[in-house]
Each structure stands twice: as structure tokens, then as C-alpha cells.
């Protein structure tokens, strides 16, 4: 269980899911599978399903969560076991203790640990899932189960549900909406993750030197993550020069060259929660005139969008603000933006940002159903239908703001000095009652970047490269 989230908070999350389920229902959530890297037994490092982390903090593979609301009224607490009372029961299926397996892969919680440490009202060995689910399904009036997550566990569940395998609903859609607004404990973790990610970006910036490879900067970033108890929250992107034209370019062997920019998109994961930060800066430590002009347009669009964030604002409003600043700025540099010229998708082929949390591209709808007036729709009250509209931001939501420009080398509509330049600037924003709180803080303005890289260059010249260090550990 996470040291950052209390057992009572996990229990409250499960109670919210129970409250959203109708009486008589049964909800089943399966873990994601382990994935082979190569060979027959060499797997990628396992990362638990975000929904299971959210509901329990449980990090082991090959498990299943069951929310049993098949009691008569479904109104009792999940911790009530009094005879004759209707119960909501939280059940876990987990891998049993196995000395032969645990000597290789580490200690398991087992059935007893699932009950004592992870809040299960009842736990069973994963091999018992089919038998137990078959019994529970007979009483269920509604089944909530999303297949396609884990083929092995899917087969168990499908077999157990038998004639109730049709008409199932998705329990993860309910959890997704619950995950969208973060608790105080979650926000504290995400601020920490943002701090760690920011320190890593500063370290990479200070170690940027012509002749080094993209991989070298990736190593710096991920060392700082590990030093602070984290891992990379996604595959680290370090793109030198025109490699930035590929939005999710993986760090490679390309060499950093003076005159080029390097685009880094990298974040840390702390206790399951991600940061997601992008910075773009010149390898030499000094922007060219064209790089500076373009960079300041992108930065202005990001700052304008961030300044507008507050409860009640929508993604659509932010996108309009960002686009207006970008278009006006690019036009001022001689770009033919607009009809007959360049479109926004020509220069920025991605959205402005996304939700952030346990997943880098976190769950939760960006648009929601809005009711229309019954008089306009011609339908009686209580049977209103609506259309999808941008959902307004709420206090406690966390999102990224990441405008960018990616300019083709060959598109003659682009003024020649700017061709081949790729820039993305991304920060993590917490929506508060008073507006935006920026969780990330790596050098961002032209002046900040040049001064920081000057400092690193001076330290290197006076004391050698080792004096810069990357053993950067934040205080707890």
C-alpha cells in the first residue's frame, strides 16, 4: 500500500464506487497482464493497473477486484458483517504465497495480506475466481465488467458469468470519473512528482553539450528520477534537431550539435502518479534569432492559456486563447496563417493538453452530456436529452498545457529561417479556487534558459564536468 495514501482514503474510494453501482450489481476489475520483453520469461518491469492502484494501492500482477452489491438492499458498509444485514462486499483474488516463486520475484501479499493490508472483506486465491464468481453471478441483477484487459483473466470471468455475458457495463468508466478530481493526498504526490521531474530537466539542461548523444541526456533524466524514488512515467523523449518533428521520438544515438535545439519530453512517476514536462533549448546554450523569435511565440501562447485557468473554464476556451496567440505571433514573423496558407494543424498537429494523474494521459471525459430545456426539446421534464459540451474545470483537476510548433524542412510556405525548428513547452497545472497552480518549474523563458546554461558552462570550465553532478536528491 502506498505510504502517501491512507487505508481510510482507499476505503473511501471503494465506497464511492459502491455508491455509484445499483443494488444487486456485481463489478469485476482485472489486473493488466505481465508483458514479455523477449524470450520466454524475460518480462518488462510490471506496473499495476491504475484503477487497481487507485482503489487499493495493490501492485502485484494476476489479481482481480470484485465489488459485490448483490445483497437485498445494497446499502450497508463494506465493513459490516453483522448477521442478517445486507452487505456490500469487497473481494480480492490474488496470487497465493509460493516459496518457489517468491524466491525469484519477491514476497506476495497472499490471501491474508489482501484482507489485512488492502481492505478486502474476503480474499481468495486467483485460481478460485471462476468458482466464486459463478456463485455470485447467479444473484446479480447487473454485471459490470470490461473485457480486453487481460486475456487469461477474461477467460475465467467469461466462463463464470455464463449466460450473463451479454449486456455488461463498464465499471472503469465510473472509476475514471472518480479519478478526475484529485484529493489533497493525490495533489501532494503530484506536486512532488512535478518537483522531481523539474529537477531532472534542469540536470539534463546542465549536461547538454555538443557531441553528446540523446541517450546521454535520457540517462541523466532517469538517474534523477531514480535518486528521488521514482521512475520514468513514460518513454523519455530526447529529440535533437529535426528529430523533434516526430512528436513521440524516442531518445536515440543522434548527436547533439551546436546550432540545433533539443526537445525533451520527460516526466517522473512517484507512487504511481505522473509528471509530464517538456522543454526545448539550444544545444549551445544560446538561441539564434529565429529560434528565439519562434520560442517566444510558443511561450506566450502557453502563458496566456495558463493564466486563464480557473474553475468553470473549458478546454475549448483555452484552445481558442492559445490559437489566437500562436496565429498572431506566427503572422508577425511572416507565416501565412489562415485561409489559403498554413492551418494550425500544419504547425501544431496535437491538442493543447490532457488530464494528468495515475496515467500520463489520464482518464475522465473531456466532454460531458448537457441537458437542454424541455420546452426546446419538446420532451417532458425528467426525460431530457442533451448534447456533449466541453466540461468545465473543477478545483482539484490536474492537466497539462503543451503548445508547440513543428516546422517542416521542405514546406516552402514556412519562412526559410524557421524551417526545421521544433518547439514544445509543457507544464503541469493544478486547478485551484484561485486559478492555476503550476506544479513544474524548470527554466522556461529565454533569459532563464540562457542564464542557467551559462552557469553550467562556467562550472564545467572551472571545475570539470563532474562538478555539475546528477546526484540531486530532494528533501522529503
Name each model-derived stretch.
Residues 1-476:
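Active-site neighborhoods and metal-handling regions in enzymes and metal-associated proteins
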